[in-house]
Amino acid sequence: MTKRYWNIDLEEMMRAGVHFGHGTRKWNPRMAPYISAKRKGIHIINLTRTARFLSEACDLVFDAASKGKQFLIVGTKNKAADLVSRAAIRARCHYVNKKWLGGMLTNWSTTEKRLHKFRDLRTEQKTEGFNRLPKRDAAVLKRQLSRLKTYLGGIKYMTGLPDIVIIIDQQEEYTALRECITLGIPTISLIDTNCNPDLADISIPANDDAIASIRFTLNKLVFAICEGRSSYIQNS
């Protein structure tokens, strides 16, 4: 994997609050190598380590995107949801930002059936098929469509398992991470000081609660994916 320069600036990270971890009582001792200090009862993340692993993650997604690989971005908590959808749309990635349905990847055949149902209902709606049904039946299908859109809207074009999964907040998305581990799908995970850094393929130590910190990390990864996609288009 070729190393590239991604302009990851320590001062910019500090302004985004990337270095603020959780309270010292809520920490995972395995995070010790990624913590540089304690301040007012809060662990401070070593941004040099953050920059190193974020750069490695950018190299990985660039290389994958330049080969036409598919990405899934997962971040379902309120602070991350909008950032995840915007980032994914910008980089033409799949995303889950509302709720992770158990077995979404490990039980892919069921997910595929749900996606087919979702596409069929969308087609019905677009062709005004609901208007030809009794009101009660139409109402049931509209509710079904609304629910499927909420949970599967970000993966509606996904035709198979993703090649790489990017996880925002490992604790929150633990089920998704375990499914990726079970299937051997490479993962990049944003980890705060209460996480286990040994679970994901690349763990990026960073504040996973601050919107600015999540945005900073996603922006770097999305830029690398977009650069990789441009390279793929030029070479194909």
UniProtKB/Swiss-Prot annotation:
It is found in: Plastid, Chloroplast. It comes from the Eukaryota. CDD domains: RPS2. The keyword Repeat does not apply. GO terms for molecular function: structural constituent of ribosome. It comes from Barbarea verna. The keyword Ribosomal protein applies. Belongs to the universal ribosomal protein uS2 family. This is Small ribosomal subunit protein uS2c. GO terms for biological process: translation. Pfam families: Ribosomal_S2. Coiled coil: none annotated. Keywords: Chloroplast, Plastid, Ribonucleoprotein, Ribosomal protein. Its main location: plastid.
